[in-house]
């Protein structure tokens, strides 16, 4: 989990590069002189984030690598958490026919036909969240490759998927 969380932190640096003012294909044509610098400085101040100007505007408008990379880092974190949740579910199975290696707290009534059974509801909930995050990353991956030539207009759906993942 620690390695996955470090990957998320590293991917954040790429997201701090702002590509505003590149116009349609990253040339900056018809953008007022100094616009990018002023806007990035103001966005950085208002958001309290360390935003910087994107140096390669053409690349950032045709490739959504930074968003896809952040999404995959979040997905990998979810994969790690999902694995831990699966282990908890299996280790807490029992009390008669399961592993019964650990006891987890009962969140609600267990089984009516198996007295004493505690359902691993929280671990199952974590699994469902992880599945959703993995699905969101699939959306980001398809959107990242859906660009055509110098422009990828799929950023809104990519950002929605990433924000949904970080909101879970």
Predicted features and spans:
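Hydrophobic alpha-helical bundle architecture
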Residues: 113-117, 136, 143-165
């Amino acid at each position: 989990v620690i390695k996955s969380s470090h990957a998320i932190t590293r991917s954040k640096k790429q997201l701090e590069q702002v590509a505003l003012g590149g116009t349609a294909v990253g040339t900056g044509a018809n953008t007022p002189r100094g616009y990018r610098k002023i806007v990035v400085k103001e966005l950085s101040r208002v958001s309290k984030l360390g935003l910087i100007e994107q140096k390669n505007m053409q690349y950032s408008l045709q490739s959504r690598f930074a968003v896809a990379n952040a999404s995959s880092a979040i997905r990998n974190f979810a994969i790690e958490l999902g694995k831990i949740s699966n282990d908890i579910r299996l280790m807490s199975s029992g009390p008669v026919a399961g592993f019964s290696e650990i006891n987890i707290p009962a969140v609600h009534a267990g089984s009516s036909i198996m007295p004493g059974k505690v359902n691993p509801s929280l671990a199952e909930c974590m699994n469902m969240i992880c599945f959703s995050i993995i699905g969101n990353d699939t959306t980001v991956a398809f959107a990242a490759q859906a660009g055509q030539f110098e422009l990828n207009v799929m950023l809104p759906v990519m950002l929605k998927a990433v924000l949904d993942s970080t909101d879970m």
